[in-house]
Amino acid sequence: VNEEEPTVLHGYMSNAGFEDVRQTIAESLNRRFGTSFAAKNLIMTVGAASGLNVAFKTILNPGEEVIVFAPYFLEYGAYVRNYDGNLVEISPDTTTFQPNLKEFEEKITPKTRAVIVNTPHNPTGVVYSEETIRKLASILEAKQKEFGTVIYLISDEPYRELAYDGVQVPYLTKYYANTIVGYSYSKSLSLPGERIGYLVIPDEADGSEELIAAAAIANRTIGCVNAPSLIQKVIAKCVDAEVDVAAYDKNRLALYNGLKELGFECIKPQGAFYLFVKSPVTDEKAFCEAGKKYNILMVPGSSFACPGYVRLAYCVSYDTIMNSLPQFGKLAEEFGLKA
């Protein structure tokens, strides 16, 4: 990177980002997932959050609907409202936290413009199975035909590489043509402050050329102009860097097994670095407050449109995990769980 011409390294470029960087990422995706992307299919963005805003700016008309599966990252609602859209929630299936496809099919209307999926999932750590993705895609294809509309599937993928036990994370453009992928390097390379990511818009998407051009302009008009130039060049040098998930996996198993032994109920996470735990009392916010007495910080499930649960993050040191377990034991005892 030091060998780059400074006026290029720190200068303006196409709103879509440096072409050589986009081509390098496209080739990496093609090797990994058997896709056929080129530089033109990628828009470099200021992280995934900005990428989602670019996508909604590009596709949403006022009053159109975006469907999301609870629990979900609550800022999705703000992103949709930024462009006068309406968020439609699908209630969770708390037995598996796979998408509730029956309710999903019932809530698709002629106003439905997009559906957001996030896998590996925040806050549950669940990975949507290939069977789930195929069924979801089939429903969308049938509804597009029924209503004569285009419905985009927005795949928010900041945790893609963080998967355990050999679990495969399906690449959604291979299952549904009208997919837009939003990716961030914040989690995979631990670069959240650098704000770098991208959108993928495949050629197979309806009106792809116009969609790609509109997304590049949207990148500018929402105020980003372009993704940070320096970190774009850095990313191009490490697109095939592999994430060492061993430390996360060690923490995952220690925390999950430790809490289960104490009597807590939780789904075993397959990806990301979160554990979604059922609160032993109806008011999970009170449970979170009680945890603070033992230096345990939890996020209430109502912050993800799923009350009655709490989210724990295990992206900390192994010592922190192990030192927390006796404190969780005290918390379990306070709430009458098996200790």
Give the location of each predicted region:
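PLP-dependent class I/II
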Residues: V1-E5, M13-A16, D20-A339
